[in-house]
Amino acid sequence: MDKKQIQPLFVTGRRRLLGTAAGAAAVSTLAMPHVARAAEPIRIGLLQAKEGSISIQAQYLQEGTFLALEQLNNQLLGRPAEIVWMDEPSAQGAAQNAQQLIQQNKVVALLGGSLSSYALAEEAVAGRYRVPFMINNAAAQEITGANCNPYTFRLQPPVPVQAAAMLPYLQSIGKRWYFLTSAYAFGENIASSFKKLLAGIGGTIVGDDAAPVGSTDFSSYILKIREAKPDLVIGGLTSADLSNFLKQWKQFGMSDKIPFTEIAVGDTDLWAVGKNNVTGTYTTLWYYKDPNNSPADKAFAAAFEAKYKKPAADKAWMGWYSAKTMFNAINKAGSTDPDAIVKAMQNWHEEDGGITVHFDKWNNQLVHRFLIVDVKKKITDNWDYFNVLRSIPENNAAAVKAFGVQADSACHMTPV
């Protein structure tokens, strides 16, 4: 295994342990097995893309993840802990790496899932091997829906939840919508969810395109949109694809003519567009300038900027929060037993933004507030792009309505 994949932790402490073991061997060889076991770190597997269109988001996800462990002094259960980070080259490759982390690296838990297609493949492996898995980015409905299993948890609200939150804003603009989404699980979820909402308000689909993931030239799509003259464009483009589209959208002079909207965007997607080109209304899970951030979130943002010399993107927070929640569950469980960790995750909760943040036990979906934001008319720096329009849900009753109930879910998993 490539040693660069393992975060070097407790180097000094481990050397001291090895020195102690050597001294003990001089006295009695019977001490050696005990010392070796004591020095063995707890390993956490991280599956995050190292290249491709999602890699910029993934960079922030992994930075937040490593920071979460550092804030625990790189320890879990009073033992040294380390993160083993592997790539997500494809859905199949991600599944193979998840299996390697479990079988060869002996990780006690998994974190990751940069894209929905990767997360769905990894989720199947986690369920098969009974390893707790916290998906920190993917939003496809199936993750905590039809493909759910008791060992997989998810941070991001599923696509239908975020789409429904956007409806009042979109309906006020008009009912003639054009769809431009990426041809994979996330984009397909966006298209199906918004089409259902549009049908419910008696609207019209005036165009519907699915672009291959990794597309760089969107000119043909933009020309079709311009000719169709929709009231707005529903986007479902991933990471670098979204960045490329918005740059070309501006170049074609469309940014001031037809509103653009998308859910579950990353700060980095828009930072890459540049402050003079960016436009739109979006949902995002967290924003570093949100005045309603909790004290813990504000402390995280400060710690991240101090360490990495840049503001914390939403993906940095998502990596940090997912890891922090998993690490808390391991410590709360008092062991690395997978079922004990799962139960600790399911029984955890905290108060934030007027709601009780928790995992619904029937599908392991995190219930947490998210934001509707729009791009500022005048952006004065390279990072602070958003006005926060609304935080959703506002209270626990609204959370139940937004995230749904077990009777309406496609998830039918057997509890551990």
Label each region the model flagged.
Residues D2-I6, G13-G19, A38-V416:
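Extracytosolic ligand-binding ectodomains
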Residues V11-T12, H34:
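Intrinsically disordered, low-complexity regions enriched in serine, threonine, proline
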Residues A24-A25, A36:
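Cleavable N-terminal signal peptides
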Residues A26-M32:
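Hydrophobic membrane-targeting signal helices
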Residues M32-A38:
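Sec/Tat signal peptide C-region and signal peptidase I cleavage site
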